[in-house]
């Protein structure tokens, strides 16, 4: 079962090679009536699945950034890390699965 939690790393931070989380989020199924939450912006995202422990996440981020550049896109926002499997769902740290998404636009 997937977990409804994730983290956000600010653009100015991950572009400098720092991948520490700036804030966390919880996924919700449908829009709420109050304004006490923030929605992930709609749009085109470059995405990669990172399998492994957190200390190797930079390898996947670098692959994704290289791919985005190679395909003629540029990053335009913060990076989202959505934890599909982590210490709550896997006893093997090398089986952690994190979806990394970065909003992009064509150059």
Give a label for each model feature.
Residues 1-107:
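A solvent-exposed interaction/effector surface
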């Amino acid at each position: 079962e997937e977990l409804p939690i994730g983290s956000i790393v600010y653009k100015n931070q991950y572009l400098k090679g720092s991948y520490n989380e700036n804030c966390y989020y919880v996924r919700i199924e449908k829009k709420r009536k109050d304004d006490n939450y923030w929605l992930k912006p709609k749009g085109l995202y470059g995405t990669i699945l990172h399998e492994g422990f957190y200390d190797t996440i930079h390898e996947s981020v670098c692959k994704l950034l290289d791919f985005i550049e190679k395909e003629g896109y540029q990053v335009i926002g913060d990076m989202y890390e959505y934890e599909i499997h982590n210490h709550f769902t896997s006893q093997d740290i090398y089986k952690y699965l994190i979806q990394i998404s970065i909003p992009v636009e064509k150059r």
